[in-house]
Amino acid sequence: GHARAGLQALADAVAALAADAKTDAELPFRAADDVLFALGEALLGAAWARADAVASAALAQGAADAAFYTAKQTRARFHFEWLGAELTHRLNMVAAARGALPFVALAE
């Protein structure tokens, strides 16, 4: 679901960045911070998706600690409903990095 789509969007953004860097050598430097933030967000999403899947399987098998697994599912849902937009924001910032920064002349 959300995690796979996020990881794929990140992979697509990095592939496009690598292709565009052939004609804009500064692009990777302008985008680096946001690529790293996006990577972190995508990996957090994957971790929460995995926790949700494990919790769902445990609950389906009648795990003794249902409250623990239900809480895991609640936290995973919170991540995707409230925090998941951060990945989209960072990927948008990576795309925005294609705009060249103006050079600032430093006073001697």
Name each model feature, range by range.
Residues 1-108:
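C-terminal amphipathic alpha-helical interaction region
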